[in-house]
Regions:
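Conserved N-terminal entry element of GNAT/NAT acetyltransferase domains
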Residues: 1-11, 141-143
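Conserved GNAT-fold acetyl-CoA-binding loop/helix
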Residues: 21-47
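Conserved beta-strand in the GNAT
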Residues: 53, 59-67, 74-79
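A conserved beta-turn-beta hairpin within the catalytic core of GNAT-like acetyltransferases
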Residues: 67-76, 85, 133-135
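A short, internal acetyl-CoA/4′-phosphopantetheine-binding micro-motif in the GNAT/acyltransferase core
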Residues: 78-85, 112-113
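Conserved acetyl-CoA-binding loop-helix of GNAT-fold acetyltransferases
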Residues: 86-99, 124
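Conserved GNAT acetyl-CoA-binding A-motif
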Residues: 101-113
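Conserved beta-strand-loop-alpha-helix junction that forms the acyl-donor binding cleft
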Residues: 110-119, 135-142
Length: 143
């Protein structure tokens, strides 16, 4: 399955809030980070100009938000609809970002909630933990 990234628009906000609630609420609850609808909306709107919808076969299946810094790409959020999880789409998006970074001699960084099993995917793709805080592992690829 192939995908394309399309810049999110204000018309996508409802989808993005619902996607975030569907994909993040359980992990946030386990971490003790309880978030209401307003909190989810606030997170969606942070760096909104760097938010991209993940589309395949004319269907929107998720989103990725990343910052392209001079020395690295920082993945702020990656969320895939539940019915498309475990089908390799998250892997493909992360591999795309790793390749984008390598083309510019950069590395990729991200933070993942300690309760989120996506950490295993990131490790399989070459990420390693370089730091952590109370809630998250901070991970990076090699440059």
């Amino acid at each position: 399955m192939t995908f394309k990234l399309k810049p999110a628009t204000k018309g996508d906000i409802d989808f993005l809030v619902n996607l975030r609630k569907q994909t993040m609420s359980e992990h946030l609850d386990v971490a003790g980070w309880f978030m209401d609808d307003t909190g989810h909306l606030e997170r969606v709107l942070i760096n909104f100009e760097d938010c991209y919808l993940i589309e395949t076969d004319q269907e929107t299946i998720g989103m990725v938000k990343y910052l392209n810094h001079p020395d690295k790409i920082f993945v702020m959020q990656l969320q895939i609809l539940a019915k498309y999880q475990r089908q390799g789409m998250g892997r493909k998006v992360v591999e795309y970002l790793i390749e984008l970074a390598r083309d510019d001699s950069k590395h990729v960084e991200l933070h993942v909630l300690k309760a989120n099993p996506a950490k295993l995917l990131y490790e399989r793709l070459g990420f390693a933990v370089y730091d952590e805080d109370k809630l998250e592992f901070h991970m990076t690829t090699q440059q």
